[in-house]
Amino acid sequence: MPALPPGSVLIVVKRGPNAGSRFLLDQPVTSAGRHPGSDIFLDDVTVSRRHAEFRWENDEFHVVDVGSLNSTYVNREPVDSAVLVNGDEVQIGKFRLTFLTKPKNHGGAGGTHDSGPADR
């Protein structure tokens, strides 16, 4: 996989029927579920039609379970909502997704700033 550009946020499907798929999180809210209109379409009976959302709030990305039947997990722990950091594993049904982010560099001595959709 090519290097992630500074300021980018990406979800990579590591396990599940569409392993290897990548989704750029470039909106304030990105939906994930079995509904064909989902931003991240996960087509399996273990996934609710409207399962979870990835939200950019208060300069952080959150994953929020939106009433799924089988729960949403972060690093193998069930969550209603959780702040995501680089490398976290999000499980939605049988799908395992990796959250990847690369902070924007603003020059200076190692100064970084987490970027999200509002910064673009």
Can you describe what each PLM-predicted range is?
Residues 91, 102, 109:
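Short Asp/Glu-rich motifs
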Residues 21-94:
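Forkhead-associated
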Residues 96-98, 103:
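Short, charged beta-turn/beta-strand-edge "cap" motif at the junction between a beta-strand
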Residues 1-42, 105-120:
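Intrinsically disordered, low-complexity acidic Ser/Thr-rich regulatory segments
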